[in-house]
Amino acid sequence: INYDSYRKPINSYDRKNRVLGKSKDELYPYYGATGQIGFIDDFLFNGEYILLGEDAAPFLDKKAQKAYMIKGKSWVNNHAHILQSLVFPEYLTNCLNSIDYFDYVYGTTRLKLTQENMNRILVPVPSIEEQCKIAQAINNLFVLIESIKASLS
């Protein structure tokens, strides 16, 4: 389910003024194409969502994250598509991070994934049990990678 129509763009100047003098517990995460980029004094969304970069995401970098999950109250800017999954969310997020976006994005200096092109992306949908197994196996591999990285530093 796509919630892009609920996004409200806000420039950095206005966002900065809205948080001025507010305590951390009065603020909500503010997300963009590749992750949290700050805080704001209001929220547009409350739930579990998958965010997929619309522009400014590293679409052609096979190792880079293009989609990520958020939970709770938040504000998402107009540089990320906002999705709620009808399948296991971790599975869909992993699928969206493994897709070759070459045929779905356009632009020379700043690649863009339009909603129309995003809707053309086909994701295999096995049973929910299989989705859970796949997502858990991928998560276990990421934990192993982080463990190895930590032991090397």
Q: What is each model feature region?
A:
Residues 20, 42, 72-73:
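Short secondary-structure boundary/capping segments
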